[in-house]
Amino acid sequence: MATVPEKIHVLIPCAGSGSRAGTALPKQYTLLQGQPLVIHTVKAFAQVAGLSQCLLVVAPGDVTLSDFLTQYGLGHWSVASVGGATRAQSVLAGLRHLHSQGASDADWVMVHDAARCLIEPAHIANLISACRADAV
């Protein structure tokens, strides 16, 4: 049986520029059914019980996400403007930010890309259950 962490955090990198997608806006802000992709992603995680801190990592100067979070009633999510040039750099900066906000080395952090909006709350809950039931 895995050691159950005191806290499970969520880190969603959202600092992409959309250059590979060839879009005017970053891909995470592309609309799907009238809402930005990132909002679909955040809503899925928002429905999962037992998550501690939920952090979205954006590029420095990006205020678009905070506006969207407020607009869709998700203003309680934390946003850190520490995104890097690559996804890996953004994740590392996000992990450092979580640590500076009290996350411990023993806590778990779930990382999920902002533009991967087809995740469902049941998928997330099942992953947590599977990890808790197996030595990781």
Label each residue range with its predicted role.
Residues V63-L69:
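Acidic helix N-cap motif at the loop->helix transition within catalytic regions
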Residues A85-V136:
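Conserved beta-loop-beta/alpha segment of the NTase-like Rossmann-fold superfamily
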Residues L25-Q28, L69-Y72, L95-R96, H123-L127:
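Short, glycine/charged-enriched secondary-structure capping and boundary segments
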Residues V48-G50, Q71-W77, G102-A103:
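Short helix-capping segments at alpha-helix termini
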Residues G73-R87:
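Conserved donor nucleotide-binding strand/loop of the catalytic core
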Residues V4-V63:
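N-terminal glycine-rich phosphate-binding loop and ensuing alpha1 helix
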Residues L51-L55, S78, A135:
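Short active-site oxyanion
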